[in-house]
Design a protein with these regions (language model features):
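Short terminal targeting/anchoring segments
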Residues: 1-75
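Extracytoplasmic/periplasmic, Sec-exported soluble proteins
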Residues: 51-55, 96-107, 152-160, 209-211
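Helical coiled-coil/dimerization "stalks"
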Residues: 52-90, 95, 104, 228, ...
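Periplasmic peptidoglycan-binding/anchoring modules of Gram-negative envelope and division proteins
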Residues: 64, 97-133, 165-171, 219, ...
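Short beta-strand elements
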Residues: 68-80, 124-132, 181
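Short, solvent-exposed beta-strand/turn patches at coil↔beta or beta↔helix junctions
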Residues: 80-109, 140-153
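Envelope-exposed proteins and targeting segments
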Residues: 80-89, 96, 127-129, 183, ...
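Periplasmic OmpA-like peptidoglycan-binding domain that tethers envelope proteins to the cell wall
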Residues: 136-224
Length: 235
């Protein structure tokens, strides 16, 4: 009986150590899993700034380097959101007209091939979602106000961006450049929906519109960086 009780005690001790060993193994696996997840998150946190730097910051640096000496002469600025804004209406079109001025044509002749070269560079081409050519007018339309003025300006802004696209397509571009332009460029007329103040900022409630600065043409880049970041996070 003593031998039986002794063997039983040994068996219980063995079961205890086996159970303890299983718990330790499970804890080790749990810590290993946590470590792997943490490493993945750290890797993702490195990838996201890299994606941003290579795309948005890279485009900003290239555009600034390429055009910084020309922007002032063109009556243009490069915004932080990668928008190039041509803001001197007397250079762009005659009042109420959608015909490109000779001076604006000369600017586009110089600007656009260089701009397109940057967008189609292998560093950026797969990260460009679309490029919008936005046409904006002021809210002014002679003695006409309200809805009719808005609709007249809508028609004018749309016609102007359409004429810009038409002119760009007739530049000396190769077939690859033309096809890429047609797939990625959009011409949008905003009428007077986005007027600017004296500081060339979006008009806020209670501010006075600057009728001159509100009239502009913008080349606005939209990247797919958001989609790429979502892909990284969802992995």
């Amino acid at each position: 009986m003593k031998l039986f009780r002794k063997n039983k005690k040994i068996s219980e001790d063995d079961d205890f150590f086996i159970a303890l060993s299983d718990i330790m193994t499970a804890l080790m696996l749990l810590f290993l899993l946590i470590s792997v997840v943490y490493m993945i998150k750290v890797e993702d946190s490195v990838k996201i700034p890299k994606i941003f730097k290579e795309t948005t910051q890279g485009l900003s640096e290239h555009l600034n380097k390429e055009f910084e000496k020309d922007l002032k002469a063109w009556g243009a600025v490069l915004d932080k959101d990668l928008t190039i804004r041509f803001y001197q209406p007397d250079i762009l079109f005659k009042t109420g007209s959608d015909v490109l001025s000779p001076k604006f044509k000369n600017i586009l002749n110089d600007f656009f091939p260089r701009y397109l070269k940057i967008m189609m560079d292998k560093q950026f081409i797969n990260n460009i979602e679309e490029i919008r050519i936005d046409g904006h007018t002021s809210s002014f339309w002679g003695n006409i106000k309200g809805d009719i003025a808005y609709l007249n300006n809508m028609e004018l802004s749309q016609a102007r961006t359409r004429e810009v696209i038409k002119y760009l397509l007739n530049l000396n571009l190769n077939e690859e450049e033309k096809e890429w332009l047609k797939k990625h460029f959009r011409a949008i007329g905003f009428s007077s929906a986005k007027p600017l103040n004296d500081k060339s900022q979006t008009l806020q409630y209670g501010e006075k519109e600057n009728f001159i600065k509100s009239q502009r043409v913008e080349f606005r880049v939209r990247t797919n960086i958001e989609n790429k970041i979502v892909e990284v996070v969802d992995k």
